[in-house]
């Protein structure tokens, strides 16, 4: 009987290892699928990508030639500041006058000394490589907290963009510095450290003014969270930091400093435009065109604020009240509300910019995966989203820009805007109780 039992059990024992291996392989394949699709794996995928980016970034530095564009001009402007020139109208570089706020000078003064008065280009590239990796970490922390974007998208946000690697480590522009500080401020907002976040936001503005495109969204969030009176101290922090940083130059020539560093009417050269190549140059330079873009920008911001960001049922003027005195009980801002409003505010500004130059790509590159994937839309499949992302990348990599590349960029922007407009409400009815903020 025992022999019979062993005989009858033998086929099962022989087939058992094969069955185990089959189950293990099936589970491994399933987990790999989930690894790329489930946002809960963001940190794991992000860690692997950051490790890969260390090699890729330093490979780019050593294999691709550095291109001088603005670095020498930055260093010349910094040297003038170090030599005691505090009149902004007298600070010049090879490419023209200094047009950035004071924070730029202080940060690049540190780079001036770290790179042997700006002459050690490899050292500067290594510093910007570290800045690139830090920026990635800050961005991944944002995506981890929102838990909306499938991790497979991050491959396209990291390794696939030659233009972004070039902006950071082959061109050494100041735009990456401003954006790194901006992403740090968003992480602070997500941690409910609103005062420190506003301080860091203002510091980012002091490096380059493009960060102000996030300001309408930030103002809306501050009013939502604190009301008018509660938001005033946060806004005062932003203003005070600008005054402190610019004080040496304001004392020397206040009009010169303000007109140079915060010149909102500065004219752009048509030869560098990425987004308006299909227009005649006369229209591109015309003041009426600029005013029309500004009107469209402000109108769309107002529409989003009224119809998409503010959906509590109260008048938008209720945001001016103390949160405890509103009809709708005060609610904590969720990570997705904070990020979606800030990213959307910036994206609307990008869409209606008077001109986008190649280095401006970093103004919104790292926000595109969120804008495309975080807002559910049945009509926009993963494949279509990747197509939009790819066309945007192609448009920014077309040099010089063409009428087709500019038109394709606007078409992609329109698709993203449409998805944002059709997305579900940013402020759902059921939100966790408000937490203590500071």
From Swiss-Prot:
Transmembrane domains' residue ranges: 41-61, 95-115, 123-143, 149-169, 172-192, 203-223, 231-251, 289-309, 332-352, 356-376, 407-427
GO process terms (BP): dolichol-linked oligosaccharide biosynthetic process; protein N-linked glycosylation
GO CC annotation: endoplasmic reticulum membrane
Signal peptide feature range: none
Subcellular location: Endoplasmic reticulum membrane
Family, as annotated: Belongs to the glycosyltransferase ALG3 family.
Record protein name field: Dol-P-Man:Man(5)GlcNAc(2)-PP-Dol alpha-1,3-mannosyltransferase
UniProt pathway annotation: Protein modification; protein glycosylation
Keyword field: Endoplasmic reticulum, Glycosyltransferase, Membrane, Phosphoprotein, Transferase, Transmembrane, Transmembrane helix
Gene Ontology molecular functions: dol-P-Man:Man(5)GlcNAc(2)-PP-Dol alpha-1,3-mannosyltransferase activity
UniProt EC number: 2.4.1.258
Pfam families, per database record: ALG3 (PF05208)
Enzymatic reactions: an alpha-D-Man-(1->2)-alpha-D-Man-(1->2)-alpha-D-Man-(1->3)-[alpha-D-Man-(1->6)]-beta-D-Man-(1->4)-beta-D-GlcNAc-(1->4)-alpha-D-GlcNAc-diphospho-di-trans,poly-cis-dolichol + a di-trans,poly-cis-dolichyl beta-D-mannosyl phosphate = an alpha-D-Man-(1->2)-alpha-D-Man-(1->2)-alpha-D-Man-(1->3)-[alpha-D-Man-(1->3)-alpha-D-Man-(1->6)]-beta-D-Man-(1->4)-beta-D-GlcNAc-(1->4)-alpha-D-GlcNAc-diphospho-di-trans,poly-cis-dolichol + a di-trans,poly-cis-dolichyl phosphate + H(+)
Membrane topology reported for the UniProt record: Multi-pass membrane protein
Entry coiled-coil feature ranges: none
């Amino acid at each position: 009987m025992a022999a019979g039992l062993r005989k009858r059990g033998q086929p099962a024992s022989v087939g058992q290892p094969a069955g185990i291996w089959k189950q293990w392989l099936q589970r491994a394949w399933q987990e790999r699928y989930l690894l790329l699709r489930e946002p809960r794996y963001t940190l794991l995928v992000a860690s692997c990508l950051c490790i890969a980016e260390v090699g890729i970034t330093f490979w780019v530095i050593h294999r691709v030639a550095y291109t001088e564009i603005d670095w020498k001009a930055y260093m010349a402007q910094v040297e003038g500041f170090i030599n005691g020139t505090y009149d902004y109208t007298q600070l010049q570089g090879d490419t023209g006058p200094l047009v950035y706020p004071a924070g730029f000078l202080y940060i690049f003064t540190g780079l001036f000394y770290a790179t042997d008065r700006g002459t050690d280009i490899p050292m500067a590239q290594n510093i910007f490589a570290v800045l690139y990796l830090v920026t990635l970490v800050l961005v991944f922390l944002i995506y981890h907290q929102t838990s909306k974007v499938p991790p497979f998208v991050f491959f396209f946000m990291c390794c696939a963009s030659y233009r972004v690697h070039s902006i950071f480590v082959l061109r050494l522009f100041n735009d990456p510095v401003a954006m790194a500080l901006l992403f740090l401020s968003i992480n602070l907002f997500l941690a409910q450290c609103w005062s420190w976040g506003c301080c860091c936001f203002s510091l980012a503005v002091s490096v380059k003014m493009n960060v102000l495109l996030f300001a309408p969204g930030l103002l809306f969030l501050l009013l939502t969270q604190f009301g008018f009176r509660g938001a005033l101290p946060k806004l005062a922090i932003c203003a005070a930091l600008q005054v402190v940083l610019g004080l040496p130059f304001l004392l020397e020539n206040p009009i010169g400093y303000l007109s140079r560093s915060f010149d909102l009417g500065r004219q752009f050269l048509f030869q560098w435009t990425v987004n308006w190549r299909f227009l005649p140059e006369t229209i591109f330079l015309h003041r009426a065109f600029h005013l029309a873009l500004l009107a469209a920008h402000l109108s769309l911001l107002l529409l989003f604020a009224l119809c998409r960001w503010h959906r509590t049922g109260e008048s938008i003027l209720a945001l001016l009240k103390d949160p405890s005195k509103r009809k709708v009980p005060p609610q904590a801002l969720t990570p997705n509300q904070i990020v979606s409003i800030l990213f959307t505010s910036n994206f609307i500004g990008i869409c209606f910019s008077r001109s986008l130059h190649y280095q401006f790509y970093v103004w919104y590159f790292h926000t595109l995966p969120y804008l495309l994937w975080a807002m559910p839309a049945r009509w926009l499949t993963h494949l279509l989203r990747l197509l939009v992302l790819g066309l945007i990348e192609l448009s920014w990599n077309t040099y010089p820009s063409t009428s087709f590349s500019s038109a394709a960029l606007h078409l992609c922007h329109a698709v993203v805007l449409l998805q944002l407009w059709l997305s579900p409400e940013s402020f759902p009815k059921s939100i966790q109780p408000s937490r203590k903020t500071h």
